[in-house]
Amino acid sequence: RDRSPSRGLGDVYKRQVQVSRLLQESGADYLAVSSIDEAVELRHNGITMPVLILGHTPKEEVSELIKNNITQAVTCRAKALEYSEEAVKCGGTLKIHIKVDTGMSRLGYLCDGDYFESGVEGICEGCTLPGLDAEGIFTHFAVSDEFGEEYESYTKHQFELFTSVIDEVEKKLGKKFKIRHCANTGAVARYPETWLDMVRPGLLLYGYGDFAQELGLKPVMSLKTTVSTIKTYPAGTAISYGGIYKTDRKTRMGVVPYGYADGYFRCLSNRYELMTEEGPAPQRGKICMDMCMIDLTDKMNVDVGSEVEIFGKANPIEHMAQLAGTIPYELTCAVSKRVPRMYIKDGKVYEKELLLRG
């Protein structure tokens, strides 16, 4: 079972629909999203498989969840009581997955150490409230993608605690959960014992990161633009805001329509290279809101209209992430919705979207 690509690449519901359709056609049998808006959008576009909302949903939306057959994560007693009350009011049953906090210290019933008994009791209560159908139970690993004995020990502790909670809750309730899940990308790649009934690969679906490379997966996304104009400047010319870069020779400078409003982190100013047909072109000066400048002095065949790759097959996103001091996932999330999307299958573009028109 796969996790939906509902996280990342900007606030883009249409993209989620496209990729979710592909996952549905490819055999995935459960999707996960972060909000009710995303889940309902999938339903309105023919996605019929079960959908789990991992994030917060206001109690006022419970009737909408039930109407659209959407599963909701329950992370604490207060939310369980709210959802139960609203489900009873509208005369329906809300399918839920109980979240257990085993060491992420974020969402979920706290069950570690002295909190084990109270956590188990709280989960049992949530599973038996009227109007709720506790289909599943899950947790989230904090360091499964990190290497080292300390991290491996912590992940093992989280998993053992999770299974202990499940055993105790099932024993008290006298029935078993249909779906138990905890394996995120790191655990999918490194801890097969944690796969249980369902896995949640996030970044792995995009083919990014070391784990994807180890598994032979290929990146599914590239970000490209074109050169919009080219000018030649004498030595000593200050480029862009603040004049942090000055040409040290006669320089052929190209302008590329990609800036921080599109998702190009300003901290990468004067540090990153964009890829042209003739090789890498250094980005010069501060990145602007809507554009940036690249040095094309030694690339005379690159002209106005020539393609430039921000990241992709020829310009790995992992390098960009390293320079920015972040992870590839944050960079994909940062690509704004004003960047047009093109969907390619079998080498051909089968759909184009300018999301601002949506």
Predicted regions and their residues:
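Single conserved hydrophobic/aromatic residue that forms the stacking wall/gate
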Residues: 2-9, 13
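Residue-level signal for inorganic ion chemistry
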Residues: 42, 137, 227, 305
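Active-site loop/helix belt of alpha/beta enzymes
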Residues: 14-26, 81-92, 102-226, 233-234, ...
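C-terminal accessory subdomain/extension
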Residues: 232-358
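Short beta-strand/loop segments at the ligand-binding rim of alpha/beta enzyme cores
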Residues: 7, 46-52, 93-95, 174-180
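Glycine-rich loop at the start of a catalytic domain that most often binds anionic cofactors/ligands
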Residues: 14-28, 41-49, 64-68, 195
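Catalytic beta/alpha-barrel core
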Residues: 28-40, 49-61, 69-80
